[in-house]
UniProtKB/Swiss-Prot annotation:
NCBIfam families recorded: PRK02509.1
Membrane topology: Multi-pass membrane protein
Localization per record: Cell membrane
Family assignment from sequence similarity: Belongs to the UPF0182 family.
InterPro entries given in the database record: UPF0182
Source taxonomy: Bacteria, Bacillati, Cyanobacteriota, Cyanophyceae, Synechococcales
Protein name, UniProt field: UPF0182 protein Synpcc7942_1783
Main subcellular location: membrane
Pfam families according to UniProt: UPF0182
Keywords, ordered alphabetically: Cell membrane, Membrane, Transmembrane, Transmembrane helix
Source organism per UniProt: Synechococcus elongatus (strain ATCC 33912 / PCC 7942 / FACHB-805) (Anacystis nidulans R2)
GO cellular component, one term: extracellular region
Record keyword ATP-binding present: no
Length: 955
């Protein structure tokens, strides 16, 4: 190709790349400005640009400077005869070094580049640790190794043909790749400059934990950058000197010239100093060792690996000084080179063999005695990292005291026993409330609302499900550009169901159902809740959902084309968006920029758009919050909250009535001695609550744990992003709940780390497990569930998340953990342990007893034979005073139509199990003692029919 054409091609490519970059920066700035947080993006952009520039210049200078020196001295001749070396062996060694470097670099870059930064911060591998190098070469897989082999051999062939164009190209690409990679790692580098003391220190090096949480991740990234720069420089310079002076044609190497040797010695000094620093860093990384019975530094790490690293750190420093001193005197003696080679081989052998020998011959025969002090640290730091040290432990001794009088005294608990699970309710919704194929209910969540009832103000547990628009369900013939971006723009409304009520046919009851003008808000007489009470707490005034879980396409609104609002009979009702979401399209020039940003060539030619049209993009709530704060990890279960429009306006929320609440976490994998278990992190705090307006798309971040050092640091870096929790509108704050993902992580760690005695911990004879249950005919692990109950020492009912535990390998229940959600008690964990000398039935044992009951099993078998299927719901353990009540709903589904109907309720208490059509009948049958006279407070709860069932002797 002519040189002028290639230059034109490069110029055009550079202009296109620059235009694309500037367009992206401009549109992102508009997007963040529309959200009221432009400084969040501009600060991030400035940091990334600074990292890219500094690292790019540094790596380019390092590699380029060495190559320039090598080019100047590549033809220098040795000043004295040197033994001739066969080039074949040298070429083989150089090729293997080059392939290993490229393979390991490719693997590390891909691991960091492909990480999902929102779910957990990207974790680079421990570059240059011998364990990582060994495992990477063995287990890297065909892709990185194959890529390294291909690049290594290919570059070597090209190098023999056109060495300098190849070296310049590879060095430029390497510098660019490292600069880009480092700029992406701003999440781990920037906090190191804003971190403050955590006050706690690690037990080995006595360093503040802020070093491990903030500075160690940054040092690991910079170590990686320096390693690539030095390794590339050394290999490239070595290749230049080896293959110069007709070495290839003569098939022999005549030795290095003094200038070349001085150059290589300077590189060797730099590498020795780097390795000394790496050994210092690797000592701290031992705090995350997984060797032996302890997570963190154990006996072998403390007395073998740590001393080895300390000795090597000193030796590398001495080697650097010796090399510098000897290089000033002249050429390195051959014995020095041989000694360095022998020392390197010996070091690798010692690192691989000595820890294994000590672990197997010294530690394992006396493991408990050797590891005891380290087990204490692992228990202590793991409990701190997961917040288990804040759990309040109490004894729960179930008594045979449950009767109708106790149930009456705990009316709000009984009234909120969940009979509808989210899965069968979603099945019902999809058949009864989906309305059209393009609507979908992606999830249903448990929440509570405080409603005015005929017996007073009370909490009511509900299941809420958003009716979102799923564009993927649109028929293929209707999938046009206009429909995708102008017509099908939003979902509509939601369903709200009490968890404890069903219609006479067994289908769920609804507080809110249907769509558009037919939307109905309905009370529930059986619960003593009027329609007016529901309307006072819940609004359907602005039910449109422009931002949700399924809203992945960008839309333009308002436009000259009306948007589909909702179907009405055989027709559709249309609407025009009047919200504040999105970015104004503006003039035609900006329209062209949006076209480039969205990669949508139709956009500039659409006649339906105006200057006032807004571009609503990044509408999927998880994508939206991750774009704003990628340093947080987000819960898998966002939930919708409906707010009375008048209350919302009075609280400064505008006339919006639907808001998403999403829990966000600060996480790290650099908390010393903290065992991550099955998680990709070993430290977690629920530091932030995120509120997203479903109509306008506004996003607010509220700090709920100001003591967390991670969120303290991020709030200093982004002061305009976060608000204190006291700034949240009370109407939304009343819907906060203990987050599911955090509770699962904590309860998972508690299975092992409830044990404080290291001897018992090591023996593993007091491990817990999650109980099992039969759900819809399949065995499944009991998942944490929300409920409303009154804790034994509490004054009133509250909204909790609860999970039971059983001993490992046994089915009886041994404890239960509760996370509190209401008021000042929010965020507290309570662990109730059962007496060890008594047998408390676990869910699996209750399930077995249900299956063994002849009447229940006969009825279920009969249903299954009649073309239907009886599906078990979640078996709930309900603590009431000092007793445990077990409740399991039973649904009936037709074999051809999976529309579940609540057909029976099974309740169990002590050695009694009953199954009846309703919860009230079950309780009446389960507790057949005489019923005390109902007080006026309790009378409105029951309908006439229900009262007759529960109180047959009352007139």
């Amino acid at each position: 190709m002519p040189r002028h054409l290639s230059r034109w091609g490069l110029a055009i490519a550079a202009i296109a790349l620059g235009l694309s970059l500037l367009t992206r920066i401009h549109i992102e700035t508009l997007w963040f400005t529309a959200l009221g947080i432009p400084t969040v993006f501009l600060r991030r952009l400035a940091v990334q640009a600074l990292l890219f520039s500094v690292v790019g210049i540094a790596i380019t200078g390092l590699i380029g400077g060495n190559l320039r020196w090598a080019a100047r001295h590549q033809t220098d001749q040795p000043d004295r005869p040197a033994p001739r070396l066969q080039l074949g062996g040298l070429l083989t060694v150089l090729t293997l070094l080059w392939i290993a470097l490229l393979a390991l670099t490719t693997q590390a870059i891909l691991a960091a580049w492909n990480c999902q930064t929102g779910r957990a911060l990207p974790f680079l591998p421990q570059i240059l640790t011998l364990d990582w190098l060994q495992s990477s070469l063995i287990t890297a897989g065909s892709w990185p190794l194959g890529m390294g082999l291909l690049l290594g051999v290919g570059s070597l062939v090209l190098f023999l043909w056109r060495p300098w164009p190849l070296l310049i190209g590879l060095s430029s690409l390497t510098s660019l790749a490292i600069a880009l990679l480092t700029s992406r790692e701003w999440l781990r580098i920037w906090p190191a400059f804003a971190a403050e003391s955590v006050s706690d220190r690690d037990p080995i090096f006595q360093q503040d934990l802020a070093f491990y949480l903030f500075r160690l991740p940054a040092l690991e990234v910079l170590q990686f950058d320096l390693w690539i720069g030095l390794a590339f420089s050394f290999c490239a310079v070595l290749a230049v000197y080896y293959l110069a002076k007709q070495s290839v044609s003569n098939a022999e190497f005549r030795g290095f010239a003094p200038s070349q040797q001085r150059h290589l010695v300077r590189l060797a000094i730099a590498i020795a100093l780097f390795l000394a620093g790496h050994c210092w860093l690797a000592q701290r990384q031992l705090l995350f060792s997984e060797l032996g019975a302890v997570y963190g530094i154990g006996f072998t790490d403390r007395w073998v690996k740590l001393p080895l690293l300390q000795v090597w750190m000193i030796l590398f420093g001495i080697a650097a000084i010796a090399l510098f001193w000897q290089s000033r005197r002249g050429l390195l003696p051959q014995r020095w080179i041989r000694n360095f080679q022998l020392a390197a081989i010996a070091s690798v052998l010692i690192w691989v063999t000595l820890p294994a020998i000590v672990q197997q011959l010294v530690v394992q025969p006396n493991e408990i005695a050797r590891e005891l002090p380290y087990l204490k640290q692992a228990i202590l730091f793991t409990r701190r990292a997961f917040g288990l040290d804040q759990i309040e432990t109490r004894t729960f001794d179930p008594q045979p005291s449950l009767n109708r009088a106790v149930l009456a005294a705990n009316r709000e608990t009984v009234q909120n026993i969940r009979l509808w699970d989210t899965r069968p309710l979603l099945q019902s919704n999809r058949q009864l409330q989906q309305i059209r194929l393009y609507y979908s209910f992606p999830s249903a969540q448990i929440d509570r609302y405080r409603l005015q009832t005929s017996f007073g103000d009370a909490l009511q547990q509900v299941i809420i499900a958003a009716r979102e628009l799923d564009y993927t369900a649109i028929p293929a013939a209707a999938k046009t550009w206009v429909n995708e971006h102008l017509v099908y723009t939003h979902g509509y409304g939601f369903t709200l169901s009490p968890v404890n009520s069903s219609a006479p046919d067994g289908l769920p009851r609804y507080f809110v159902k249907d769509i558009g003008a037919n939307t109905r808000i309905i009370g529930d007489a059986s619960l003593g809740i009027s329609t007016e009470a529901v309307k006072a707490a819940i609004s359907t005034e602005n039910p449109r959902i422009y931002y949700g879980q399924l809203t992945r396409n960008y839309v333009f609104t308002p436009s000259r084309t009306q948007e589909l609002d909702y179907p009405s009979g055989n027709d559709n009702v249309y609407n025009i968006y009047d919200g504040k979401g999105g970015v104004t399209l503006g003039n035609y020039a900006q329209r062209l920029l949006f076209s480039l940003y969205l990669r949508d060539w139709r956009l500039p030619f659409s006649g339906d758009l105006t200057a006032q049209t807004r571009v609503l993009f990044r509408r999927q709530i998880e994508d939206r919050v991750r774009a704003i704060a990628p340093f947080l990890r987000y819960d898998a279960e966002p939930y919708l909250v409906s707010v009375n429009a008048d209350t919302a306006e009075a609280s400064g929320l505008g006339r919006s009535s639907l808001f998403w609440i999403l829990d966000a976490y600060t996480v790290s994998d650099r908390y010393p001695y903290a065992d991550p278990g099955e998680q990709p992190f070993n430290y977690i705090r629920n530091s932030v609550k995120v509120i997203i307006d479903a109509y306008n798309g506004s996003v607010q971040f509220y700090i709920v744990d100001p003591k967390d050092p991670l969120i303290q640091t991020w709030s200093r870096l982004f002061p305009s992003l976060f608000q204190p929790i006291d700034a949240m509108a009370p109407v939304l704050r009343s819907h906060l709940r203990y987050p599911t993902d955090l509770f699962k992580a904590q309860s998972s760690q508690l299975l092992t780390y409830h044990v404080l005695d290291p001897q018992v911990f090591y023996n593993r004879d007091d491990q817990w497990a999650y109980p099992r249950e039969i759900y819809a005919g399949e065995t499944a692990t009991v998942q944490p569930y929300y409920l409303i109950t009154r804790l034994p020492t509490a004054a009133s009912e509250e909204f909790l998340i609860l999970t039971p535990f059983t001993p490992l390998g046994r089915n009886n229940m041994i404890a239960w953990l509760a996370g509190r959600s209401d008021g000042e008690e929010y965020g507290r964990l309570l662990l109730y342990e059962f007496p060890r000398q008594r047998l408390i039935f676990g869910p699996e044992q209750i399930t077995a007893r249900i299956n063994q009951d002849p009447q229940i099993s006969e009825q279920i078998t009969l249903w299954n034979r009649e073309g239907s299927r009886a599906a078990e719901g979640n078996l709930l353990v309900i603590p009431i005073d000092q007793a445990l009540l077990y409740v399991e709903p039973l649904y009936l589904e037709a074999s051809r139509n999976s529309l579940p109907a609540l057909t029976r309720v099974i309740t169990a208490y002590q050695d009694r199990i009953v199954m009846t059509p309703s919860l009230l009948e079950s309780l009446q049958k389960l507790f057949p003692d005489s019923t005390p006279a109902l007080t006026p407070l309790e009378q409105p709860v029951l309908t006439t029919e229900q009262s007759a069932v529960l109180n047959p002797d009352q007139p």
